[in-house]
């Protein structure tokens, strides 16, 4: 039983890495800097409730941020999000 549980955990971790890793790579510039506008929305680790904005690749979209953690694709207003991420 322990081996089956271990294999399921390894499989789950593999799937999570396959989904997450390409998204992080596509957010990286050629010089290694991360383009925050290409990062996925990330609500963070806490359970507080802040309505903030992230750039979804096309436009700025509202989401709920928990108050701690997450990534830098998070803006206090739609205007700030568009100013940073929208291409002219």
Curated annotation (Swiss-Prot):
Give the protein name, as stated in the record.
Kunitz-type U15-theraphotoxin-Hhn1c
Site positions (Reactive bond for chymotrypsin) are: 47-48
Disulfide-bonded cysteine pairs: these are 37-85, 60-81
- Write down the SMART domains for this protein, in alphabetical order: KU
Prodomain positions: 28-33
Q: Which PROSITE patterns does this UniProt record tie to the protein?
A: BPTI_KUNITZ_2
Q: Give a brief account of the tissues where this protein occurs.
A: Expressed by the venom gland.
Site (May bind Kv1) residue list? 39
UniProt-annotated location(s):
Secreted
**Where in the sequence is the signal peptide annotated?**
1-27
Q: Which Pfam families does this one have?
A: Kunitz_BPTI
Please list the GO terms describing molecular function: potassium channel regulator activity; serine-type endopeptidase inhibitor activity; toxin activity
Kindly state one GO CC term assigned in the UniProt record: extracellular space
The residues covered by the BPTI/Kunitz inhibitor domain are 37-85
Q: What does this protein do?
A: Serine protease inhibitor that inhibits trypsin at a molar ratio of 1:1.
InterPro entries for the chain: Kunitz_BPTI, Kunitz_BPTI_sf, TFPI/VKTCI-like
Concerning SUPFAM superfamilies, the annotation shows: BPTI-like
Species whose genome carries this gene: Cyriopagopus hainanus
GO biological process annotation, one example: envenomation resulting in negative regulation of voltage-gated potassium channel activity in another organism
Instruction: Tell me which UniProt keywords the record has, alphabetically.
Output: Disulfide bond, Protease inhibitor, Secreted, Serine protease inhibitor, Signal
Q: Which family does it belong to?
A: Belongs to the venom Kunitz-type family. 03 (sub-Kunitz) subfamily.
